[in-house]
Amino acid sequence: HSSITNVRLAGLAVSTGSQTRDFMADGLALGHDRVMLERTAQTIGLRQRKVAAPGITALDLCEDAARRLLDAAGLDPSSIDAVIFVTQTPDHSQPNNASLLHGRLGLATGAAAFDLSLGCSGWVYGLQQAALLCAHGGAARVLLCAGDTLSRLTNPGDRSTDPLFGDAGSATLIEKTGRSTPLHFVLGADGSGAEASA
């Protein structure tokens, strides 16, 4: 358990893929049974998802979200002290997405940039890291981006995973503040069952 004070979430912007995939239409086109598709749709609660157009990456989606966030907040990119990029679908192995976004946005050369390779828990881990940078690392503003294009990794014939994953990017602004209301974190992991998901 940890609590971090003097930090606030100052803004959030999201950018989704521009195309819409329909779970039922995709499943019927692959020859799946309509009754089974209806049952699956009822279970997962989704019938549509947003996916990125060909050539659009997680970096592109997060850049769009970050630009809109900075514009809405009236902030110059040079006021950002660090960028954290959470993704499991980076554009390249090197350089990392955070460094590429740093360059695209024109952040100051003194601004830190690093990726976190995490899935569902990634934004929360990124938020903790951003809050720590603001509270104890000398940063006044941190840009936390989380984005993936997981639709490109799933098998369209797999009804258990394909309908769950779309493509999106988000940008969250975390700022140092005099406010004492703490952010509370309880982080943990259990890697003992990793082979069960393979």
PLM-predicted stretches and their roles:
Residues 39-43, 47-60, 88-142:
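Conserved catalytic cysteine-centered active-site region
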Residues 15, 86-92, 118-123, 146-151, ...:
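Acidic, glycine-rich active-site loops and adjacent beta-strand->loop/helix elements
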Residues 9-10, 40, 79-86, 112-114, ...:
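Beta-strand segments within the central parallel beta-sheet cores of soluble alpha/beta enzyme folds
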Residues 74-79, 138, 178-181:
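Short loop/turn motifs at secondary-structure junctions
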Residues 135-168:
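Flexible, glycine-rich active-site loops centered on histidine and acidic residues
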Residues 1-55, 158-198:
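Condensing-enzyme catalytic core mediating Claisen C-C bond formation in acyl metabolism
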Residues 65-81:
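Phosphate/pyrophosphate-binding loops at sites that engage ATP/ADP/AMP, CoA/4′-phosphopantetheine
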